[in-house]
């Protein structure tokens, strides 16, 4: 199991969308947790039979589509389960805990945006495991969006929306700016850049969760959290 370090920003001030790379000293809160399961623990095993079937449909589709396009470097089903499925499922409880403790609200019926979702990780897996969450998958590449829409259709997920757009453009749309309870990004850019992309999408009182897997660098994470967006 490859551990995640999850950095969680609590958005408590209403701010204007940022100009690129304009940062100032901190005004957000942080929770950093390790979300890897103990050896022998299976988050997949806690899913119901229907959810497990949906995950298998996802894995089959991922491996098939991966033969004609670059979705993941992983080629074996067992490795997909370990590196992608279990890792994605492992961040659910930290997200719930952080949302309840930081936002003082229920972690049910959340509006989630997965920024730079790629192959739908972790967003599609979160949508399967948490059917009460409304998950928006944000991806800029058309072929990947086609894959995401295919999987959403094959798995029968009604709580998933696929949007083809870049994060730095989406927040300029009034329909999406500050409209999500939680924004999630997984290893798509440096922490500071992730914050600039994701924070404009999060409502006041919401969370930005940065999941950095495979040898998480806690000092770098801590340094990055000393900055937030300028007005």
Where are these regions (language model features)?
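N-terminal auxiliary segments of SAM/dcSAM-dependent transferases
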Residues: 1-83
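Conserved SAM/SAH cofactor-binding pocket of Class I
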Residues: 89-188, 193-196
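Residues at alpha-helix termini
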Residues: 45, 69, 155-158, 228-231
């Amino acid at each position: 199991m490859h551990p995640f370090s999850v950095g969680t920003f609590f958005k408590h001030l209403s701010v204007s969308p940022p100009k690129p790379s304009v940062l100032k000293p901190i005004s957000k809160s942080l929770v950093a947790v390790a979300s890897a399961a103990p050896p022998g623990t299976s988050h997949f095993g806690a899913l119901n039979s229907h959810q497990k079937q949906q995950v298998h449909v996802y894995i089959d589709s991922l491996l098939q589509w991966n033969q004609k396009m670059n979705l993941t470097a992983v080629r074996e089903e067992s490795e997909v389960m370990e590196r992608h499925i279990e890792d994605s499922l492992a961040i659910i409880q930290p997200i719930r805990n952080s949302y309840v403790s930081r936002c003082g609200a229920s972690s049910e019926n959340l509006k989630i945006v997965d920024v730079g979702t790629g192959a739908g990780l972790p967003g599609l897996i979160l949508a399967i495991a948490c059917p009460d969450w409304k998950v928006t998958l944000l991806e800029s590449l058309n072929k990947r969006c086609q894959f995401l829409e295919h999987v959403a259709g094959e798995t029968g997920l009604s709580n998933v929306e696929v949007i083809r757009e870049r994060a730095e453009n989406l927040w300029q749309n009034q329909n999406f700016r500050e409209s999500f309870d939680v924004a999630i990004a997984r290893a798509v850019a440096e922490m500071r850049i992730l914050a600039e992309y994701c924070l404009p999408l999060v409502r006041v009182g919401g969370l930005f969760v940065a999941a950095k897997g495979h040898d998480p660098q806690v000092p770098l994470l801590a340094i990055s959290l000393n900055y937030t967006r300028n007005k």
